């Protein structure tokens, strides 16, 4: 039996279980897993010094657009923070934004011919076909309870710049291997 990799995002509004796609986006999944587990070197954007420990723990979902997506992974909580490095997209032809609850990398397009992926990610609550070929899809939310949590987060009250009025906290990310 093959093993599958899952990420469990524990939030203050419930847990979200995501099946990761290492066969379709190996660099992206490795980056996410290593940041989640605290085994990847990064630069703390608050201090400019080397960071250590689980990267995502205690961060917030800083951008929520009802009917579109929820976005997190920025330790600054503003939408412009990252781990101090970037990497290219891994666009796979089998993965398209043709269903809800997909996990993808948030980025700022390409700069100098290179990708701008770092640590920020989003989960869709729609089918944004206009994002095909522009953002690496590297996982999918599984289970009805997890999908309900995503929907709950996607419908919290927001203010300026799509920021939640009450913080939606990503308390921890746990990586699990399960038999297929």
Predicted regions located by residue number:
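Cyclophilin-like peptidyl-prolyl cis-trans isomerases
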Residues: 1-180
